[in-house]
Curated annotation (Swiss-Prot):
GO terms for biological process: base-excision repair, AP site formation via deaminated base removal. Its EC number is 3.2.2.27. The active site is at D77 (proton acceptor). The keyword Cell cycle does not apply. NCBIfam families: PRK05254.1-1 (NF003588), PRK05254.1-2 (NF003589), PRK05254.1-4 (NF003591), PRK05254.1-5 (NF003592), ung (TIGR00628). One of its GO terms (molecular function) is uracil DNA N-glycosylase activity. Belongs to the uracil-DNA glycosylase (UDG) superfamily. UNG family. SMART domains: UDG, UreE_C. InterPro entries: UDG_fam1, Ura-DNA_Glyclase_AS, Uracil-DNA_glycosylase-like, Uracil-DNA_glycosylase-like_sf. Keywords: Cytoplasm, DNA damage, DNA repair, Hydrolase. It comes from Acinetobacter baumannii (strain AYE). Its main location: cytoplasm. Excises uracil residues from the DNA which can arise as a result of misincorporation of dUMP residues by DNA polymerase or due to deamination of cytosine. This is Uracil-DNA glycosylase. The gene is ung.
Length: 237
């Protein structure tokens, strides 16, 4: 793809890991991205507080390069409380109380694989091993859940899934809840494994369908079957 000087300049301003930037170039130069940039700029001009901090918006992609992805855990949008969101779905910064969904995830992990329940909720260790912790929407206004939906992020993360579909195989996609499952309809199930369950939020999980889903053991079993190093799900203290 031959780029003009203007296009190269636009790409240079995107703080994105190189393998993802190359693969997502058509989207990064699309009207969707222009519109999204304008929206975020207007939010900042209006002095709105946006989470996660700008340097962490693309954390999921920057920590887990395209050719390192083994697993995708799809979330909806970032936590909207102070010091929570760190750019990884379901993850929070160290020192922050565990959100209820993450507490349920840790309980399921403990029941499934006997992994001790972590006192902190920073999932960076998973991301570094190839777990792409991808929210559908990558930003949110402080205290306003879902406030940045339908501004272009959904199309961006659809493009991420499409790149994985086309360029990779034997990835495990973990889709918790109806929202993630709808978004995951575009995944090629002949090339990848798709695991579904209810959402880990207390409201959904307590109705049944999340606890006992055993996605962590099923993920590692599939990876081993395809000669791929399994994930060490235990977080450091």
């Amino acid at each position: 793809m031959q780029l003009t000087e203007q296009q190269q300049d636009k790409l240079s301003k995107v703080q994105l890991e190189e393998s993802w930037k190359r693969s997502l170039t058509p989207f990064l130069l699309s009207p969707y991205m222009d519109s999204l940039r304008d929206f975020l700029f207007q939010q900042k001009q209006a002095q709105k507080t946006i989470y996660p901090p700008s340097k962490q918006i693309f954390n999921a992609l920057n920590i887990t390069p395209l050719d390192h992805v083994k697993v995708v855990i799809l979330g909806q949008d970032p936590y909207h409380g102070p010091n929570q969101a760190n750019g990884l779905s379901f993850s929070v910064q160290r020192g922050v109380a565990l959100p209820p969904s993450l507490r349920n995830i840790f309980h399921e992990l403990h029941t499934d694989l006997g992994v001790p329940i972590s006192r902190h909720g920073d999932l960076t260790k998973w991301a570094e091993q190839g777990v792409l912790l991808l929210n559908s929407v990558l930003t949110v206004e402080a205290g306003q859940p879902t406030s940045h939906q339908k501004q272009g992020w959904e199309e961006f993360t659809d493009a991420v899934i499409d790149v994985l579909n086309e360029q990779r195989e034997h990835i495990v996609f973990i889709l918790w809840g109806a929202y993630a499952q709808r978004k995951g309809q575009r995944i090629n199930r002949e090339k990848h494994l798709v695991l579904t369950a209810a959402h880990p939020s207390p409201l959904a999980a307590n109705r049944g369908g999340f606890f006992g889903c055993k996605v962590f053991s099923k993920t590692n079993q599939y990876l081993k079957q395809h000669g791929i190093e399994p994930i060490d799900w235990q977080l450091d203290a």
